[in-house]
Amino acid sequence: MQSYQEEYIANVKEIAALTAHKSPGGRSFEEYLEELLANRREAEQKTNRNMELLREGLQPTLEHLFEADAQELASLREFASGLLAGTNEVDGGLFCQVHQALLSLARLNRDRNQMIQELYWLGIGRNNLCNKMVGLETTEAEKYTHKMRLCFTEAAAYLKYYDEIEDTQTRGYILRSRANISLGHFRSPGEKIRLTRQTLEILQDRSYQEKEPGLPWERFIYMTHQQMASSISRSKTEVMAPEDIASLMDSVYIVYERRIRESAKQSQKPPFRSAFSYASINYYCGLDTLDGLLSKMELLMDETDIHDFSPDNMYGLISIPAFYCQYLQEYPERLPQKKEYVESLYQKILDYLRLFPDASGNESLFFYLRQLSCTFVETGDGISYGEFLQKLLILFAPDIYVHSYMVGKASCAFCRIILFEEPSYFDDIDHIRAVEDPRQKQAAVLDYAMQCGLFHDVGNLNFISLYTQISRQWFAEEYEMSKLHTVAGNMSLSQRPSTRLYAEAAHGHHSWYDGSRGYPGSYRRLECPQRQMVDIIGITDFLDSITSMGQLHFGEKKTYAEAVREAILLEGRRFSPLLTARLREKEVAEALRKAFEEGRREAYYHLYEQEASS
């Protein structure tokens, strides 16, 4: 690996550490704040340095890739392997860019073996992106799933030329690609099961095995059985066909029996994942009742340890509860008797997350948390969904929490100014119009503004690595993917009573006032009763975002005065003229600036309190 590549990876890891939540360690708030701000200044410097490294080191290499010698190409591949290794993500987007460039080179050189290898690795990188789509509708995620699957499908198509290809490694990539076609989300579980079944037939074909005895066939077959075992559809609306259940049963039992043997040798219990799959398939085959399955899941979850950060314990402590709550969502009549247990589950998970060491880049952890967030069940007495989301932001994305808090405070200041001039400005919003007393109405508006600010960016939790680890300007594909945070936020907030009121703020804060641009297309301003508040969240989000470190993902940071001028220039197009007219007044712009500053300090104090009490 070249020196600039090593420095880039080291900087990404250091930036993640600098911006992660910190323990006060007995220091005063002022000392704590001073360190946080110093860390963010250092992180900004390292981000600028990384962009310089890519500009001066990687970009010239990629532009002259056809002239690169074998050593340079090997260095690039080693660099890529350091960007994404298994579930440890340093920079998945750059991983894809490097392998896309290497694939283009292989195509031009007509190097079939190298082309198959690059298709495989590009597919792995794209699958990493697809894993961030948990909870989104299939229509939203399909574009990314399709790109991922195309890579594996093209590589797997060379199975037709298996006899011609003599390289053992290349044959292995073809077979692994064939298995990976079944990765990602499908519209029905039957599609995934059918593809996996076909892969098993190929891997178990003696003719292929005899032609390449050097490949680890047993391992390939076992891993494909694992993939099949993970295809269980835990939904009462998606009924699996009998032949699919039969295939699942075979794979689940094969995996479970092997795990039992391996665990027995080490005097351990079977892994949580295998035990859960075994219990699930027994339920789907009619060998157990739903109550029986829930009881077995409870036994597994009770065995987890909040001090064990192994992949299997993490699965048992976060992912199994996600499926447990999914059953309770689909069968709500079971919730009353499980209420106290669910509340204790969420508390145990939060205790575990507070203790979790060095979570940055742990894609498995964030994948399981996305699952848990999608199936979260509010009991009425335990932690609300809104509180749970705020705790996740504080623990894993403190900068997003600080930004959201600042947007909330500035929105309150803007609302206060508007209410002084037009007390009925927000009366299109049902719960605001219902309040008659002027003081109570103002309090309701300000509380609503604050909560909308706090929750407007929760969809970023789906794409957390983009915000907490990417230390460079985003690639076009990453920017497009980040737009889905509005859809993800709207979906998650709208499905729970405690957050339903704030869903439109998450949905529409990047839309344009005149509808000419912005996103998502599903937000239609004139059809939204909360549009006045969404307008305010949109403009305050803009004013803070382009003046913060996060702006480095798009270009250069602006000063606050420049941000105000830019917002005014977008009057009537991106922003409501009713808001920009007030922003022209120096007193209003200054009041918002002070609110941002106060909000930043208050948000950091909340971080300080949370860490001091944990």
Language-model segments: which ranges?
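A short, hydrophobic secondary-structure junction motif
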Residues: 99-103, 127, 151-162, 256, ...
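Short, charged, surface-exposed loops that flank catalytic or proteolytic processing sites
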Residues: 473-474, 551-562
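Acidic/His-rich, divalent-metal-binding segments that scaffold phosphate/diphosphate chemistry
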Residues: 344, 348-480, 523
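An active-site-proximal "capping" alpha-helix that borders the catalytic cofactor pocket
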Residues: 405-416, 481-494, 559-576
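Non-catalytic interface/linker regions that flank or bridge core catalytic/transmembrane domains
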Residues: 2-406, 410, 613-614
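Histidine/acidic-rich helix-loop-helix segments that form or flank divalent-metal centers
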Residues: 166-169, 214, 429-453, 493-539, ...
